Amino acid sequence: LWTGSTTERGAYQNFGDIFIDFGAAGGNNPRGPVDYRRELDLDDALAKVVYKADGVTYTREYLASYPDDVIAMRFTANKKGKIGFTVRMDDAHTGGQRTVTGNSITISGKLTLLSYKAQLTVLNEGGTLQAGDSTLTLTGADAATLLLSAGTDYDPQSPDYLTRSDWKGKVSTVAARAGSK
């Protein structure tokens, strides 16, 4: 994502920020975790955090998949019903739109030349997922996977740098396809 025009390049822009509050939903925001361990596997693009709190072992895994075009976050616990959080995604740009429907939060907008869309989808195993005005709140789940997909209408082969394909639909399709794996 960048600002600029067809004749002048602008600056790189991020899509936005994802905020996950594990305490707001009565989730796994422990007081004084023990056996805290972080791992980074560069070969598999996997980051992992494991810790114990109140007799429960929590695992958080983060994976960036180029073939699937998603970033995946997976939260698990060794006891049922212990995963809970509130998540929101904020657009980094003024004038963008955020929508929360079903199990997804979407941000979209237009910069000087490029249009963009990012979608965060929550796939919960058990528990209850509730949509708010700007958040999704999960309570009492056994596990949860969050999938982030994003795209723009940029096409470097096009004379005006804009694609004619259904790039917005692809963002939603990518998350659905990755969620089925």
Report the location of each language-model feature.
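Aromatic-residue-lined binding/catalytic grooves and analogous aromatic/hydrophobic interfacial grooves
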Residues: 1-181
